[in-house]
Curated annotation (Swiss-Prot):
Compositionally biased residues, Pro residues: 217-230
Record organism: Bos taurus (Bovine)
Role played: Participates in pre-mRNA U12-dependent splicing, performed by the minor spliceosome which removes U12-type introns. U12-type introns comprises less than 1% of all non-coding sequences. Binds to the 3'-stem-loop of m(7)G-capped U12 snRNA.
Basic and acidic residues bias locations: 115-130
Pfam families reported in the protein's UniProt record: RRM_1
Ranges of Basic residues composition bias in the record: 269-283
Subunit composition and interactions: Component of the U11/U12 snRNPs that are part of the U12-type spliceosome. Found in a complex with m(7)G-capped U12 snRNA. Interacts with PDCD7.
Protein name stated in the entry: RNA-binding region-containing protein 3
One GO term (biological process): mRNA splicing, via spliceosome
Residue span, RRM domain: 27-102, 419-502
Location(s) in or outside the cell: Nucleus
Keyword Disulfide bond belongs to the record: no
GO molecular function: pre-mRNA intronic binding; U12 snRNA binding
Cited InterPro entries: Nucleotide-bd_a/b_plait_sf (IPR012677), RBD_domain_sf (IPR035979), RBM40_RRM1 (IPR034147), RBM41/RNPC3 (IPR045164), RRM_dom (IPR000504)
Length: 516
C-alpha cells in the first residue's frame, strides 16, 4: 500500500482561501452566541450539519468570543443555512447569524484538514456531489431536523405500546417531576388537545385496564425464533426464508397489537350489585317483653327525673324559735320602767283622763334598735345598695406607697377646691353607670336641687378618651369624693381624681353660689 500523502504546510495567509471565498464574501456566515457548553468539535459538527464546507471556531475570550465562521459551497446554501440558524434557540442561547463583512474577510476561515484530505483522496468528485445531495435530502425530509433527527421517517415503522397501568403512570409522573422541560411539553400538548388544565383539585381516578382485564383472552403465543444457522446451501433460499420469517413475525406482531388495542378500548363493565333480600322475622310477645330499653343504645347519657325536675321537699312541722339578745332585754326593762313612771304620773290626773287612757289597748311604744344606732354612728356615710359603700371604696383603693411607684400619680396635685371633679386614667369598659355607682353616694337623690346638679360627662372618643367630669352639689361633697375615690381600682386601672380646673358654674342668684 502506498503511504498517504502528507498535507502541504499552509501559509499564514491561507493560500486556499482564494479558491473558497469569492470577493463578495456571500458564502461565509458569522455565527454568534454559540453555547459555551459545546466544544470546538461539536460546534464544527453543528455547522457542517447545516451544510457548511469549512468551519473556524474563535477563542472563548475577547470581542468575538463564542463565535465561528462557516463557509458554504455556494450562496444559495449559505442563505438557506442563515434562515434556519438565525434566532435558533440552542441550550438556552439564541443564535445570531449574519454574512461576514468585508473587514472580516481577512479572518475568513481556512478549510479544515479533514476537507483537504477528502479532496486529496482517491474518491472521484461525482461521489462527493452525490453524498452532498443525499445529505440535503436527509436534512429536508428528516423527522425533526431542528432536533438533530435527520433520517427520513420509515413508512413501515409502527409503535406497540402496552396499555396504561399504575406502574407505567407512576414512572411517567416521576419523569415529569425530574425533567422540567418534559413537564412543560406535556402541558403544551394538553393545551393543544383542549384537555382540562391539571391545576385544579384532584380529579376522579378512571378505571384502569389492569383492574378489568378479562381472563378469557390471554395474549397470543410468540412465534418461535428462527434457527441461528439455517441449513440452506443456496443464498437465494436463505434470503427467501429470512423474508418469509420476518413477514410472518410482522403479521403476528400486527395481530397482537390489534388485539391489545381492542382490549384497551373496551369499556369495563361495572359489576351489578346483588340485592340480598332480608327476611324480617316476626317477633313473639315473649321476646318483646324482654327487650332492653333503647336508652342504652343512645348516644346521650341517661337522665333521671331528679336531674330534670325539682324534687318536692317534704312538708313538716317547722319549729319557730326566737333568739332575744341581751340588748333587747335591757330595752324591755327600760320600757317597763317608763310605763311605770307614766302610770304614776297619770294617777295624779283627774279620773276622766285616767279613764280615757285606760280605754282600748293603751299606748304601744316602738322598741329602740340599738344596733342600727351604733352602725349609724360608726358609718354615717353608708349609702343604699344603689351606690358603693365606704368599705368597698377602702378595699378597692391602692396604698400611698403604690401611688408613688405609679407614673400616673407622680405629679399629682388635687387642684383648687370646687364643686366639679376631674377623673382620668379610666379603663375602656367604664360607663356612666359605673361612675354613678361610685360618686352617687355623695348626692342626696331625695333633694331635687342636688339631683339636678349631679352631672357626669364621660369622654369616650377623641383626645379626651378615658376621662370624665363630674358635677357634685357642693365643695364639701367634691372634697369628700376626691379623698375617698382617688386611687380606686376600676376595671384594673386606678382612678386619678382631681378638682376640675374650669371656673365655677355661673348662677344668677346668690343662693346658688352658696350651695357650691
Amino acid at each position: 500500500m502506498a503511504a498517504p500523502e502528507q498535507p502541504l504546510p499552509m501559509s499564514r495567509g491561507c493560500q486556499n482561501s482564494s479558491s473558497l471565498s469569492p470577493p463578495r464574501g456571500d458564502r461565509t456566515l458569522l455565527v454568534r452566541h454559540l453555547p459555551a457548553e459545546l466544544t470546538a468539535e461539536e460546534k464544527e459538527d453543528l455547522l457542517k450539519y447545516f451544510g457548511a464546507q469549512s468551519v473556524r471556531d474563535l477563542s472563548d475570550k475577547g470581542r468575538l468570543k463564542h463565535t465561528a465562521f462557516a463557509t458554504f459551497p455556494n450562496e444559495k446554501t449559505a442563505v438557506k443555512a442563515l434562515t434556519r440558524l438565525h434566532q435558533l434557540k440552542l441550550l438556552g442561547h439564541t443564535l445570531v447569524v449574519e454574512f461576514a463583512k468585508e473587514q472580516d474577510r481577512v479572518h475568513s476561515p481556512c478549510p479544515s484538514l479533514g476537507t483537504e484530505k477528502k479532496k486529496r483522496s482517491d474518491d472521484p468528485v461525482e461521489d462527493d456531489k452525490e453524498k452532498k445531495e443525499l445529505d440535503c435530502l436527509t436534512i429536508e425530509n428528516g423527522i425533526a431536523p431542528n432536533h438533530g433527527l435527520t433520517f427520513p421517517l420509515n413508512s413501515c415503522l409502527k409503535y406497540m405500546y402496552p396499555p396504561p397501568s399504575s406502574t407505567i403512570l407512576a414512572n411517567i409522573v416521576n419523569a415529569l417531576a425530574s425533567v422540567p422541560k418534559f413537564y412543560v411539553q406535556v402541558l403544551h400538548l394538553m393545551n393543544k388537545m383542549n384537555l382540562p388544565t391539571p391545576f385544579g383539585p384532584i380529579t376522579t381516578r378512571p378505571p384502569m385496564y389492569e383492574d378489568y382485564m378479562p381472563l378469557h383472552a390471554p395474549l397470543p403465543p410468540t412465534s418461535p425464533q428462527p434457527p441461528e444457522e439455517p441449513p440452506l446451501p443456496d443464498e437465494d433460499e436463505e434470503l427467501s426464508s429470512k423474508e418469509s420469517e420476518y413477514e410472518s413475525s410482522d403479521d403476528e406482531d400486527r395481530q397482537r397489537m390489534t388485539k391489545l388495542m381492542e382490549l384497551a378500548n373496551l369499556q369495563p363493565k361495572r359489576p351489578k350489585p346483588i340485592k340480598q333480600r332480608h327476611v324480617r322475622k316476626k317477633r313473639k310477645i315473649k321476646d318483646m317483653l324482654n327487650i332492653p330499653s333503647s336508652a342504652s343504645h343512645s348516644l346521650h347519657p341517661v337522665l333521671l327525673p331528679s336531674d330534670v325536675f325539682d324534687q318536692p321537699q317534704p312538708v313538716g312541722n317547722k319549729k319557730i324559735e326566737f333568739h332575744i339578745s341581751t340588748d333587747m332585754q335591757v330595752a324591755f326593762k327600760k320600757d317597763l320602767e317608763k310605763q311605770q313612771n307614766c302610770e304614776e304620773e297619770n294617777s295624779d290626773l283627774p279620773a276622766t283622763e285616767a279613764d280615757a287612757s285606760n280605754i282600748g289597748f293603751g299606748k304601744i311604744f316602738p322598741q329602740p334598735n340599738l344596733n342600727i344606732t351604733e352602725e349609724i354612728k360608726d358609718d354615717s356615710d353608708e349609702m343604699p345598695s344603689e351606690c358603693i359603700s365606704r368599705r368597698e371604696l377602702e378595699k378597692g383603693r391602692i396604698s400611698r406607697e403604690e401611688m408613688e411607684t405609679l407614673s400616673v400619680f407622680r405629679s399629682y396635685e388635687p387642684g383648687e377646691p370646687n364643686c366639679r371633679i376631674y377623673v382620668k386614667n379610666l379603663a375602656k369598659h367604664v360607663q356612666e353607670k359605673d361612675l354613678k355607682f361610685i360618686f352617687g353616694r355623695y348626692v342626696d337623690f331625695s333633694s331635687e336641687t342636688q339631683r339636678i346638679m349631679f352631672d357626669i360627662r364621660l369622654m369616650k372618643e377623641g383626645r379626651m378618651k378615658g376621662q370624665a367630669f363630674i358635677g357634685l352639689p357642693n365643695e364639701k361633697a367634691a372634697a369628700k369624693a376626691l379623698k375617698e375615690a382617688n386611687g380606686y381600682v376600676l376595671f384594673g386601672k386606678p382612678m386619678v381624681v382631681q378638682f376640675a380646673r374650669s371656673a365655677r358654674p355661673k348662677q344668677d342668684s346668690k343662693e346658688g353660689k352658696r350651695k357650691c
